[in-house]
Amino acid sequence: MKRTYTLQEANQALALVRVIAAELIERRASRRRLARQREQLESANTPEGLRGELAELDARIWEHDEATTGCKAELEDLGMTVLRTNPLTIHIPGVSRTGDVVFCWEEGEGSVCFGHPLGQEQHQRRPLRVRAKGA
């Protein structure tokens, strides 16, 4: 089932999206730290056996990768798509008074205020033009 959102519904869904996004962002940062530690251990050139430490880091990195995949799946269950994870950018299929659109939310934004015409999701996002009530 393909879900589409009005702009109002997309903004209401942000409460849940932000919770999922916070976990994804935290996992992204932790994974990056672990990967740096792994690189440092690998390049240490010490005679001690570091295989155990490397295996432990690999296991922790894998856990973060799995959790990130789970976060993406939760967003996909809502009908949304993760365009990229840094910065976290989420596409929300939508409908406006002029037809189908793709709303675009990026980490740190307070509301859904950017979008793309359908079929132009890879292009630079554009500010949404919202008509004032009564206009």
Walk through the language-model features, giving the residues of each.
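Long, hydrophobic N-terminal alpha-helical segment
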Residues: M1-A44
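Generic alpha-helical secondary structure signal
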Residues: Q8-N11, A55, E66-T69
